[in-house]
Amino acid sequence: MEKGINQRKTEHIRLCLTGNVEGVNKSTGLEGINFIHNALPEIDFADISLESSFLGKQLKAPFLVSSMTGGSELATKINQNLAIAAEEKGWALAIGSTRAFLESDQHKESFLIRNQAPTAPLIVNIGAVQLNYGYGPEECQRIIDKTNADSIVLHLNSLQEAVQDGGDLNFKDLLPKIEQVCKQVKAPVGVKEVGFGIDGEVARRLYDAGISYIDVAGAGGTSWSQVEKLRSKDPLNKAAAEAFNNWGTPTKDCLVSVRGELPEAPLVASGGMKTGVDAAKAITIGADVVGFARHLLKAAMETPEDVIRTMEQLELELKMTMFGIGAVNLEELKNTSRVSIMGQSLMDK
């Protein structure tokens, strides 16, 4: 096992920390959104509230530690540091693919982090494609029970699997199997991409199948075609991956598309999120929760305190943004007219 899934997880972490793994000339699209400064905000900064909720639990901020890793010695340190920090700051917390945990108890501590985060909304994760490779509702429920998680998210990563040496490529007829997971698992089931994005048409099909929430995981941050290109030992795969160095739908476009199709669905924005200003922009165009992944990874390699400092900076940046437009809570931020999208001010409407 150490030379299989677990080794791959360690390689992924190392490459995300040290490699050139962002898409080429690909952004989140959020740079096209600008806030219109309010010189007279008429609020007290001390009154600004970031309180939110997700999966039926209260959050101190509308933030999620997005799925990153699990199933290796290095992942154990990372996930435990993230769990301690998420509990302290009141964030939601997701862990990386739990397939390795279903197959072996090796490095189980990287997944068993509920003790470090007893009250945080906890999400476990497995590839949706595994529903075509022997996994089903029973395995999904088992991993929820083993980790005492609040939810499971199925990740859609077709292009990553295509580029990955030995990837699982049978994505045929997954939707009815996803629907069965939603019907049989006794917890909310979400779906996320891994950095290439989910649009409104796909989100509608998933939501109609019973999915509880959508994480768009758009382009503009880590490109898994580039991560797998750096890992690949196959010259043909490596060369082909280069053609996909700017593949994917930008996070901003995903949010607009999904929110337009599903006005009421719980929506997570992730993919290239680096600042609290990014988060504010995402919330303004439809996100309920904002996920951060690689932006937290370097700190998670150190200590929980390092992660907490990074989290506190993101929270402060979000509060400063809200102060700058006179929004005292997230509802006011969502409904603000003090935003310009691609040069079109909502204040003019």
UniProtKB/Swiss-Prot annotation:
Cofactor(s) required, per the database record: FMN; NADPH; Mg(2+)
Keyword Flavoprotein: yes
Binding residue positions for substrate: 8-9, 97-99, 160
Binding positions (FMN): 66-69, 97, 125, 192, 222, 272-274, 293-294
GO terms assigned for molecular function: FMN binding; isopentenyl-diphosphate delta-isomerase activity; magnesium ion binding; NADPH binding; oxidoreductase activity
Signal sequence, start to end: none
Pfam family, one: FMN_dh
Gene3D superfamilies named in the record: Aldolase class I
Main location: cytoplasm
One GO process term, biological-process aspect: isoprenoid biosynthetic process
Gene Ontology cellular-component annotations: cytoplasm
Enzyme Commission number(s): 5.3.3.2
UniProt keyword annotation of Cytoplasm present: yes
Subunit structure: Homooctamer. Dimer of tetramers.
Described function: Involved in the biosynthesis of isoprenoids. Catalyzes the 1,3-allylic rearrangement of the homoallylic substrate isopentenyl (IPP) to its allylic isomer, dimethylallyl diphosphate (DMAPP).
Family statement drawn from the similarity comment of this UniProt entry: Belongs to the IPP isomerase type 2 family.
Protein name in the entry: Isopentenyl-diphosphate delta-isomerase
Organism in which the protein naturally occurs: Oceanobacillus iheyensis (strain DSM 14371 / CIP 107618 / JCM 11309 / KCTC 3954 / HTE831)
